[in-house]
Amino acid sequence: MSAEQDKEPIALKRVRGGDSGLDGLGGPNIQLGSPDKKKRKANTQGSSFPPLSEYAPPPNPNSDHLVAANPFDDSYNTISYKPLPSSNPYLGPGYPGFGGYSTFRMPPHVPPRMSSPYCGPYSLRNQPHPFPQNPLGMGFNRPHAFNFGPHDNSNFGNPPYNNVLTQDINMPGQHFRQGSAENFSQIPPQNVGQVSNPDLASNFAPGNNSNFTSPLETNHSFIPPPNAFGQAKAPLPKQDFTQGATKTPNQNSSTHPPHLNMEDPVNQSNVELKNVNRNNVVQENSRSGSAEATNNHANGTQNKPRQPRGAADLCTPDKSRKFSLLPSRHGHSSSDPVYPCGICTNEVNDDQDAILCEASCQKWFHRICTGMTETAYGLLTAEASAVWGCDTCMADKDVQLMRTREAFGPPAVGGDA
């Protein structure tokens, strides 16, 4: 049987490929069969390789096969741009490009009706969450601490407001007070939706609370601890201490009658501290023109009071020299502007950017009235040799446009007037 089986393929090979056995081994029959084997091998090898990634470039790229991020492709956006966790304070899910174009979403523990009093018509735009998802972290992250977009930054997100609020955290036996946002940390998570909602709705609605006139006005509704009173003086240039000393005990007693026994000693000590330090604080932080005149008379100087807001960066020897150029302004009454603006004729206050016309008229001008940018104002005040002239003086031909560097001493500038 084995011999017959060996003869049959040889006979078949002779019929197909030729008479000799060598033709069967190396003849055209193997050449005819080899392309089929190669095709089968190619098919099996091609299927064994995994398919290329849909985001990988094609093997032969040309102008018809460009792989780029399509901002209008929804399927590509949802895969590539994943929303970041809400614990990141600077890249919340409300920012465009991170998490898609989502609407304004409130945390689950805050009712949705709270968004209308302080967000207004901007509640459905791309804005970060007003509070983080964790209720224990409320009021401590600066991007979430009542910072509701560019229109409300001046009211709810300024550093003086947040710095003063965070000084009242370590008060013993303290409960949720009116106008203090850091006390969310002392409220349990299950009570946040019940306790914080009425107070927030009454504090941040412009029409409900008459005391909430400005972000610094809410500083009257709580009292900082005694050891932090020295820190509270710097970021409060606008606070009226006569109202703050009399208003805080009344508000605390009316808002929290059950806690009078625990907070009365603290209130009394804080009021005493305010009365002791009131003179120094008023001299440093007063903004009205009458306070400027009284400070000038009391100190016996002709210079304007110290600028409380960022004046150390912009105040130069040239700036201090400019203050001493107007000795006749010293005897004016408090009703008249001490330093009137040459354009709007309003008072030039300490915290406002002002420019002195050293070219001729020696008048003060608001930076906003002159149209000068903050960058140009910073360069002007940083350069001691720079001289600015108003439009009226520059229109006259009598102004000396070229000066030597030695002519910038105080006698030379006083002689130009």
Swiss-Prot record:
* Short motif Nuclear localization signal, span: 35-41
- Zinc fingers (PHD-type) span which residues? 338-396
- Keyword field: Metal-binding, Nucleus, Wnt signaling pathway, Zinc, Zinc-finger
- An example molecular function term from Gene Ontology annotations: zinc ion binding
Gly residues composition-biased segments = 18-27
Under SMART domains, the record lists: PHD
Please provide one cellular component term from the Gene Ontology annotations of this protein: nucleus
Tell me where in or outside the cell this protein is found.
Nucleus
Skewed-composition ranges (Basic and acidic residues) = 1-11
Polar residues bias locations: 180-221, 240-256, 284-305
InterPro entries on file: Wnt_Signal_Transd_Protein, Zinc_finger_PHD-type_CS, Znf_FYVE_PHD, Znf_PHD, Znf_PHD-finger, Znf_RING/FYVE/PHD
Location of region: Interaction with BCL9? 371-389
Q: Identify the stretch(es) annotated as Interaction with H3K4me2.
A: 339-386
The positions making up the signal sequence are none
| Main location group | nucleus
Q: Pfam families, from UniProt? A: PHD
Any one GO BP annotation for this protein = kidney development
Record region (Disordered): 1-71, 175-265, 284-318
Subunit (UniProt): Interacts with BCL9 via The PHD-type zinc finger motiv, and thereby becomes part of the nuclear beta-catenin/TCF complex. Found in a complex with BCL9L, CDC73, CTNNB1 and PYGO1. Interacts with histone H3 mono-, di- or tri-methylated at 'Lys4' (H3K4me1, H3K4me2, H3K4me3); the interaction is enhanced by the interaction with BCL9.
User: What is the designated name of this protein?
Assistant: Pygopus homolog 1
Q: Which organism is it from?
A: Mus musculus
The taxonomic lineage of its organism, from the top, reads: Eukaryota, Metazoa, Chordata, Craniata, Vertebrata
